[in-house]
Amino acid sequence: GCLGDKCDYNNGCCSGYVCSRTWKWCVLAGP
């Protein structure tokens, strides 16, 4: 998933995004 898509530890995100443990959706990866 990309920005705002739901995710979890077993469901990754698009390149450049990471799964937020807090909100359980994809957010921009930090530096």
Swiss-Prot record:
GO terms for molecular function: ion channel inhibitor activity; toxin activity. PROSITE patterns: HWTX_1. Its main location: secreted. Keywords: Disulfide bond, Ion channel impairing toxin, Knottin, Secreted, Toxin. It comes from the Eukaryota. The keyword Disulfide bond applies. Disulfide bonds join C2-C14, C7-C19, C13-C26. It is found in: Secreted. SUPFAM superfamilies: omega toxin-like. Expressed by the venom gland. Coiled coil: none annotated. The keyword Transmembrane does not apply. GO terms for cellular component: extracellular region. The presence of a 'disulfide through disulfide knot' structurally defines this protein as a knottin. Agglutinates erythrocytes. Belongs to the neurotoxin 10 (Hwtx-1) family. 51 (Hntx-8) subfamily. Hntx-8 sub-subfamily. This is U2-theraphotoxin-Hhn1a. It comes from Cyriopagopus hainanus (Chinese bird spider).
